[in-house]
Amino acid sequence: QIALRKQGYPDMECQVVLTDEGSDTALLKVNQPLPSYLPVRERGYDLLGEQITTLGFPLTGFGSQLQVTQGNIAGLQGIGNDIRFMQFTAPIQPGSSGSPLLLPTGEVVGMVTHTIANTQNMNYAVKYQLLSALLTSCGLNVSELTHNISQTPLSTPQITKQSKSALWLVGCGA
């Protein structure tokens, strides 16, 4: 059993709609409307060096509150020049998988997937282009997910405040 969890809300059961083992991603469906969602970047430009913020729920055994980290996009390819991934420097821990990488505009440009143990800044995320393709393949219109893009850069506290209502912990089991 998979459920979305958030303090102050009842758990929402969800089903796996699509998985992509190669990129370590899954698309989940809930049978009720979510209060909000994050805008996904539609168009590309060179993201190398861009500041990013990650928001997620790592190491939930130590606490289930939202955690915020910052860094930069350090590389535009993954291990072995895999173009599905980008490398970033924001610190992550076990349980960070699925966390969004957000630009200062509040747009999702990636989703955390993995890190290389015992290294520094060897963290990877699936690029927004693959996320957009997965959403589109399930009949979702990504251009409708651009409602909340700031025209001016936001501070990290502003990004956090704007985004946190759309973030839920994905839990397995009772």
Regions found by a protein language model. Give the residues of each.
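C-terminal cap/linker of serine protease catalytic domains
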Residues: 1-2, 13, 36-37, 58-64, ...
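Conserved hydrophobic/aromatic beta-strand scaffold that supports enzyme active sites
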Residues: 25-29, 68-72, 85, 167-169
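Short, compositionally biased
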Residues: 66-77, 124
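Catalytic nucleophile loop of clan PA
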Residues: 91-112, 124
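Conserved active-site neighborhood of the chymotrypsin/trypsin-like protease fold
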Residues: 1-63, 81-85, 140-149
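Extracellular/periplasmic catalytic domains that process cell-envelope and extracellular macromolecules
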Residues: 19-21, 44-47, 65, 79-81, ...
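Conserved hydrophobic positions within beta-strands
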Residues: 14-16, 73, 101
